[in-house]
């Protein structure tokens, strides 16, 4: 059978690889109105109701309700900070984003157990010089104890350059095949299921939770 989708906001790419958003029915729903609606509801609800991209909760490896919400404005004092980079192959490849996430390990005083919190998430389509600037800026801001770069695509050049600069960056070389990310997520799913992971109440954190909940069925799996 054929699946016909009518997303409320259509996404196109310009000649420079930039993203262009246009409303499906501008005479009735202009882009500003749709973006206001998008900002007013959870990401999973927007994707399902307006973008025709629902995610099946029962099929999720990592479920949304397993995450704890960090309600305070500032994150806890972290004993160990980890940054992870998944670099896109090319900016004009519309399917790929560059994803940079920062995580912290902290002692939960209520449970006397070590927990993990998402400190920041950036997902963009960028060129290598922009990637280098972004990585160096985030590194300076967070001063991570560990910076893991997926050694593929533009991540290879970034890893080599940061090593030459004497920065403590580690490489991760993925195996070939689509099952590698699935195996990695399965390996850490119990940590989230044990309610040891926290996310702040921000839009970018919500997008991380939604993308993980939709894996491996979502079109993008960069985060």
Regions found by a protein language model. Give the residues of each.
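Hydrophobic residues at beta-strand termini and immediately following loops
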Residues: 4-7, 119, 172
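Gly/Thr-rich phosphate-binding beta-strand-loop-beta motif of the actin/hexokinase/Hsp70
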Residues: 75-106
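Signature of the SF2 helicase/ATPase Hel1-core->accessory helical subdomain module
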Residues: 1-13
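Hydrophobic, well-ordered secondary-structure elements that form the walls
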Residues: 50, 86, 100, 135, ...
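Nucleic-acid-processing active sites and adjacent nucleic-acid-binding tracks
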Residues: 101-149
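Anionic group-transfer/hydrolysis microenvironments
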Residues: 88, 122, 152
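C-terminal nuclease/phosphodiesterase catalytic domains that cleave nucleic-acid phosphodiester bonds
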Residues: 44-53, 91-94, 101, 153-223
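ATPase catalytic-site recognition across NTP-hydrolyzing enzymes
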Residues: 12-87
